[in-house]
Amino acid sequence: MKKRVITFTLLSCMSLLFIQGKTNCKYEKKIADYNYIIGTQTIGAKYKFTNETNLVETAKAIRAMGSNLLKMSMSPRYFWENYDIPKNESICSLTDLAKEKNMKQVFDLDFKYYQIWAYEFSQYVVEPEGQKKDENQIQFINGLSDYDSIRCYREIYDLAAHLLKTYSGTGKVFMLGNWEGDWHLRWDYDRTKPANPKTIEGMTRWLRVRQKAVDDAKKIIPHKNVSLFYYVEVNLSDLALDGKECVINSILPNLNPDYVSFSSYTATNPPRSETEMEKTLTTHLNYIESKMKPKSGIEGKRLFIGEYGWPELGFYSNEPSYRSPEEINKRAKWVIKTAVKWGCPFVLWWEMYNNELTNDGKNRGFWLINDKGEKTPLYNTHKEFYLESKVFLREYVKRNKKMPSESEFRSAAIKFKSLN
């Protein structure tokens, strides 16, 4: 009898441990996949430290920092401006590029979230050797033709279909979008003159076509446990607040994208204190959101910060000649806390490795790891934030046997030691 009781007790304990283990595993997966809001990106890195392509090296560095989000670029410039991936003449579309071994390698890494600048090969006009012309990436200046509209739709649809089929069952979240839309609308970079009405019309059509291609792929392609969204990026919010023509005022109200990205330099560069940052950035975020139509099926706010940042070395007349890494870290914390409090689903620093050079060839210092391989204070802020977040989530689960609400996480996050 005693032996039977001991055996029963042992089996009961083992069963309890098994159940607890299953419970812990369930929550650990949710913790690994959690949206930690803050992150970074890798586009156009000017240096590297391994024999891998700069895309793969920087993606691994971002993952090693603790981020489960990767922002990157896919375009016909993959081999010279964006990355040092070897040129391959057989790559003629975004889907071809998605199958390229370096691209596939980063898609196979254990990132949960991917944000991708997606520019169609079918819309691209090759630049003269050694020249970069952003207008060559688009065909909607003075209007988008039916021919280019059809080609645009087909290429984005095919990429969307490929991602849904290839990564079905992985739980990954893909977001396709564009770089700073106002510099497509004003492709000559002249913000002083009115936007061309025909270009406004053409850009509106381009963005609608891309959203429809994503929507149609999601309806038609069988898939499970993989998500795909489309976003539009805006940037000249100061013009918007002045009532001038820009993507926010002239195009966004006529669209209904899944998400909107704000490349936020016009809001985040001027403030000189945390109080001023919170007031200014909140004003800009509120204004942009006021131009967005509501959309069912997506929880939470749909406006995020796709870029913010400051280089160590100044270049333009409206910026200091030098900012210390400590000053940059302090300012970044202002942005993060304001955006987290406001409800931005993502807040992305520009960027992991620097991409801009001074006239004499020096790295300007848009980085979390510098050109000597040194990690900046802001790198450590990100790393520590991820660690604190996981501690908070595990302790919350232990107490409550469930994950926290988004608002509970945000309320806790702005008080983390890493941000204060």
Task: Describe the role of every protein-language-model region.
Residues 1-26:
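Bacterial Sec-dependent N-terminal signal peptides
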Residues 53-58, 94-104, 236-251, 282-292, ...:
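Alpha-helical scaffolding within the catalytic cores
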Residues 173-179, 204-244, 298-311, 347-352:
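Aromatic-lined carbohydrate-recognition surfaces of secreted/lumenal glycan-active proteins
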Residues 183-192, 264, 294-332, 349-368:
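Active-site clefts of carbohydrate-active enzymes
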Residues 250, 254-317:
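Glycoside hydrolase catalytic-domain groove-lining segments
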